[in-house]
Amino acid sequence: MPEKRMEEFKALVKRCRTVGLVPLIDFIPNHVSRAYLADWDGHDDFGEGDDHHTFFSPEQGYFYLTSNSPGDGPPLHLPDGLFEGEMTFGRVTGNNAVTWNPTRYDWYETVKLNYGYNFLAGLPALRLLPDWTSPKQRVPKTWRIMDDILSFWQGLGIGGFRCDMAHMIPMAFWKWAISRSRVRLPDVFFMAEAYNDHMKTTPGDPC
């Protein structure tokens, strides 16, 4: 029953733990549905307070199309006619398509999340993210929200995460998030999806 889904989930986790199984769930950090809306109280949501006319700002949740972006928009033109495009603004797709006219080969039903660096700027932008060389650099908002999400599921007894499209997320985030998760649960398990021929590399990874 939909209204009992959290209770059912908790019961499943308990049964797994009782027989010595460690439950893992899917963690999708790169993108969300274009219709995504969080329903957890007391937490910031992706995109809250964003300037819909600015392509990139470190504290924004998404990347927004501008008047200089390719294509004839607004509105956003989606290729299949099944989803209504955003009418007064547009957001970059989950596969980094910066256009008002994403194709059917783009992930047009998804939206790219912003990890505090402009993915169009390359390596120089990655150097602005917080890491051991710049510990005083402000932790981007999306990082903080993702840490809250991981913490929530760990609090329910989840012991690990299968990380979707892990190579599209900055290495600096993974180091930060995994370290924080291991403070909460030292043996927490992270498994990265190996999606293409460059599965060893993430933004900022020297491999």
List the model feature ranges, each with a label.
Residues 31, 44-47, 59-60, 64-73, ...:
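Active-site-proximal helices and loops of the catalytic beta/alpha 8
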Residues 1-152:
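Substrate-binding/active-site clefts of carbohydrate-active enzymes
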